[in-house]
Curated annotation (Swiss-Prot):
GO terms for cellular component: cell surface; cytosol; intercellular bridge; microtubule cytoskeleton; plasma membrane. The keyword Phosphoprotein applies. Pfam families: WD40. One of its GO terms (molecular function) is heparin binding. Gene3D superfamilies: YVTN repeat-like/Quinoprotein amine dehydrogenase. It is found in: Cell membrane; Cytoplasm. It comes from Pongo abelii (Sumatran orangutan). Plays a role in angiogenesis and cell migration. In smooth muscle cell migration, may act through the RhoA pathway. Residues 1-63 are annotated as: Disordered. One of its GO terms (biological process) is cell differentiation. The modification Phosphoserine is found at S20. Its main location: membrane. This is Angio-associated migratory cell protein. WD repeats lie at residues 89-129, 132-171, 173-212, 214-254, 258-299, 315-354, 356-395, 398-433.
Length: 434
């Protein structure tokens, strides 16, 4: 793979605060970036000070499932397969995957078979099953220090295990689950449910706090990097930025400021000053996390001529499925259901590149420290793109059905995918100089 040097690229780009976003409109407020990340100990202490309510909970089913035989781990499939390891213990579509953030040596996967497994990336060896779910496991992830792993199913049953002892340490039944995420600095778990609530628990003691949204599902959410706020998107198109300690919304975006359809995804930049939201209305909105104001709106050129959607209407042929910020250049990537990958310049708010896939994009991830963006799609292929040129660098194949989720190791040496073919795969990424 060849790529152009990016030296000087970031330096030649004018800073965001000197530019206008909406044509002749002026920027109302300049957001000053924090001098550095907050101290983890301070954040953990602040989370200790949060007033949680005591919630009654029912005891979960403690009966374990019978593990499938270890020979379910295989090394290859018939046909082209670029993967190094295939994990095949799931008996139905595998919906989600997450890597342990501390060592990037373990994966947790959850699937339609009501099961979740923690396994080793190097050889696919099963460490333990996260047993007891009665519905499809759609969310799974490790805590910030990799000591805990959480799984959540569609019915709203959440469970947490201690990784080293493989023992279940906490469980809770909330409403139908929409999303789940660990706090970036503390053993605190957040989740959004179909009743519009966002839940926050201390784990494992179970102290609970709820953030009541509108009377509709909380469809996506993300904790901001400072660990003190969270942004949540809702089915009615509204966006709320919550103060996690106070339990109150700092900003609410609705009507023309919000989306004209359910939100599908949300992302933040590295310092948490900017938020990107995506929706079935085919728009991606750039929001200042400080002021709560929309400072940019992105639509792909392929649908730019479509009439505006009315309230509650959805695009029949397209929607935003995934989005994210580049960490080294003022670029954002947006992936659409029609297979379009759009690279937008945040400084000029213009479309820089448009890369077409043969089928819908499921998810995208930026490689840390570079301008390379990864996409997975319904055709079962992982692709790497140079966002500076819009050029396809390489692709990785091996699945026989759509890819439903993927994760990238911190050093970008491994891509781990899950698929409708009942498999999870580990691909080794060749990394020339970016």
């Amino acid at each position: 793979m060849e790529s152009e040097s990016e030296s000087g690229a970031a330096a030649d780009t004018p800073p965001l605060e000197t530019l206008s976003f909406h044509g002749d409109e002026e920027i109302i407020e300049v957001v000053e970036l924090d001098p550095g990340p907050p101290d983890p100990d301070d954040l953990a202490q602040e989370m200790e000070d949060v007033d949680f309510e005591e919630e009654e909970e029912e005891e979960g089913n403690e009966e374990g499932w019978v593990l499938e035989p270890q020979e379910g781990v295989v090394g290859s499939m018939e046909g082209p397969d670029d993967s190094e390891v295939t994990f095949a213990l799931h008996s139905a579509s595998v919906f989600c995957v997450s890597l342990d953030p501390k060592t990037n040596t373990l994966a947790v996967t959850g699937g339609e078979d009501d099961k979740a497994f923690v396994w080793r990336l190097s050889d696919g060896e099963l460490l333990f099953e996260c047993a007891g779910h009665k519905d499809s496991v759609t969310c799974a992830g490790f805590s910030h220090d990799s000591t805990l792993v959480a799984t959540g199913d569609m019915s709203g049953l959440l469970k947490v295990w201690q990784v080293d002892t493989k023992e279940e340490v906490w469980s809770f039944e909330a409403g139908d689950l929409e999303w789940m995420e660990w706090h970036p600095r503390a053993p605190v778990l957040l989740a959004g449910t179909a009743d519009g609530n966002t839940w926050m628990w201390k784990v494992p003691n179970g102290d609970c706090k709820t953030f009541q949204g509108p009377n509709c599902p909380a469809t996506c959410g993300r904790v901001l990097p400072d660990g003190k706020r969270a942004v949540v998107g809702y089915e009615d198109g509204t966006i709320r930025i919550w103060d996690l300690k106070q339990g109150s919304p700092i900003h609410v975006l609705k009507g023309t400021e919000g989306h004209q359809g359910p939100l599908t995804c949300v992302a933040t930049n590295q310092d948490g000053s900017l938020i990107l939201t995506g929706s079935v209305d085919c728009q991606a909105k750039l929001v200042s996390a400080t002021t709560g104001k929309v400072v940019g709106v992105f639509r792909p050129e392929t649908v730019a001529s479509q009439p505006s959607l009315g309230e509650g209407e959805e695009s029949e042929s397209n929607s935003v499925e995934s989005l994210g910020f580049c960490s080294v250049m003022p670029l954002a990537a947006v992936g659409y259901l029609d297979g379009t990958l759009a690279i937008y310049d945040l400084a000029t708010q213009t479309l820089r590149h448009q890369c077409q896939h043969q089928s819908g994009i499921v998810q995208l991830l930026w490689e840390a420290g570079t301008a390379v963006v990864y996409t997975c799609s319904l055709d079962g292929i992982v692709r790497l793109w140079d966002a500076r040129t819009g050029r396809l660098l390489t692709d990785y194949r091996g699945h026989t059905a759509e890819i439903l989720d993927f994760a990238l190791s911190k050093d970008a040496s491994l891509v781990v995918t899950t698929s409708g073919d009942h498999k999870a795969k580990v691909f080794c990424v060749q990394r020339p100089d970016r």
